[in-house]
Curated annotation (Swiss-Prot):
GO terms for cellular component: plasma membrane. The lineage of its organism: Eukaryota, Metazoa, Chordata, Craniata, Vertebrata. Belongs to the MYMX family. A motif (AxLyCxL) lies at residues 58-67. This is Protein myomixer. Keywords: Cell membrane, Membrane, Myogenesis, Transmembrane, Transmembrane helix. Residues 1-5 are cytoplasmic. It is found in: Cell membrane. Disruption phenotype: Abolished myoblast fusion. The gene is mymx. The AxLyCxL motif is required for myoblast fusion. GO terms for biological process: myoblast fusion; myoblast fusion involved in skeletal muscle regeneration; plasma membrane fusion; skeletal muscle organ development; skeletal muscle tissue regeneration.
Length: 75
């Protein structure tokens, strides 16, 4: 009999653990989507305030450099 209870307990723990993990993933996805939207809006507003073409080109150059560095680390 105790073996049956241990089996049931492990099944219940797995069930609740998987549901909790799924809920956590959904919450994280919603938070990241919202944060990305806000960040995009902020960056767009900053970009519109920059009037100098040279400044915009310098910023884009820095962003491309950072992206290339990140790509090299992944490989």
């Amino acid at each position: 009999m105790p073996a049956v209870f241990l089996l049931l307990r492990s099944l219940v723990v797995r069930l609740f653990g998987s549901r909790l993990a799924a809920s956590g993933v959904q919450l994280l996805r919603r938070i990241l989507t919202t944060a990305t939207g806000h960040l995009g809006t902020v960056l767009r507003n900053i970009w519109e305030r920059i009037s100098s073409q040279q400044s915009k080109e310098a910023i884009l150059g820095c962003v491309l450099c950072l992206l290339n560095m990140h790509k090299k680390v992944d490989n």
